[in-house]
Amino acid sequence: MYVEMIDETGQVSEDIKKQTLDLLEFAAQKTGKENKEMAVTFVTNERSHELNLEYRDTDRPTDVISLEYKPEVDISFDEEDLAENPELAEMLEDFDSYIGELFISIDKAKEQAEEYGHSYEREMGFLAVHGFLHINGYDHYTPEEEKEMFSLQEEILTAYGLKRQ
């Protein structure tokens, strides 16, 4: 998995960046998304608020904003066409590899770590996995969806070693 990481705040340690990258690669392996690309941007509450207004019509900052990339065109070819044209097959693979981007508010992560009584590292890991699952089609609008997403989220975090304290 390729992850572009951007720290707009200038406050995220190399350890947190490495943990985020390692954890996203681990989550990608667990979910069969190893050959995908995404971006993670660390932001302030102010920037999170701006992004929420722009993309979600929500007038407040949130801990993580997940923007799933969905191409506006449906490109499909039959197997025979792809077998005859390997360059086309490779182009389609590249086109399909970008899954989206996450914006993680470091301010919210700090607030929530304190509120929930666990480490900042655990909260940052939780937000990365939560956002990753969202851009891969998981959601929690219904009780069934919530159960599926949250159990997978906890399974990934626990297997990685970021348990609730």
UniProtKB/Swiss-Prot annotation:
Subcellular location: Cytoplasm
Origin superkingdom: Bacteria
MF GO annotations: metalloendopeptidase activity; RNA endonuclease activity; zinc ion binding
Record-stated family: Belongs to the endoribonuclease YbeY family.
Signal peptide: none
HAMAP family in alphabetical order: Endoribonucl_YbeY
UniProt binding sites for Zn(2+): H130, H134, H140
Full protein name: Endoribonuclease YbeY
Function: Single strand-specific metallo-endoribonuclease involved in late-stage 70S ribosome quality control and in maturation of the 3' terminus of the 16S rRNA.
Organism for this UniProt entry: Streptococcus agalactiae serotype V (strain ATCC BAA-611 / 2603 V/R)
Gene that encodes it: ybeY
InterPro entries the record matches: MetalPrtase_cat_dom_sf_prd, YbeY, YbeY_CS
Obligatory cofactor(s): Zn(2+)
Main location: cytoplasm
Enzyme class, broadest EC rank: hydrolase
GO cellular component, one term: cytoplasm
